[in-house]
């Protein structure tokens, strides 16, 4: 379970056997448009984490209070999106089989599909909470069904209507917003409704997958995502 290219995230000092949470990276950006580089995300996130503290005064919690294991990055095929997704799915399925929670670092947003496939197989009735500037609901992008611009559309094919909850969305084609009006729960521009949704899902104990694209943040706070979208 340990990849050879490990620079661990700060505070992830547990062994795999003892861990409740297993972090792993998917350094993949083969369908990225506008500007490549998301494949360097997992290693960069780990490296920069050592400039932080493990304790959060906002949460009054410390990463060292939790049993987290960082298993490093997958070695993914850059020539085949489906092969890369299969590897991501297999690792998530292995972690779930061992009774642990997978935590995935990307990588472009398409990597989410591999993990969602595994989690939805383990937990029927899965809900997806999605933070993003973009709807990611295109049926295809430049003829490709497996694209960062289509990932939530492919996820919808797995979890179905009413199980995708989107926040901060402020960019996409008209057709994506029309699709969302019929099939997803979209909250445009901000996080309005998130607290109520979280309370509802916790009360009913339904399974949840959280996926975060950093461009949900305003470029003033996070300028590097591709492409950046203002007015967050």
What function would you assign to each model-found segment?
Residues 1-232:
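Conserved alpha-helical scaffold segments that buttress catalytic/binding sites
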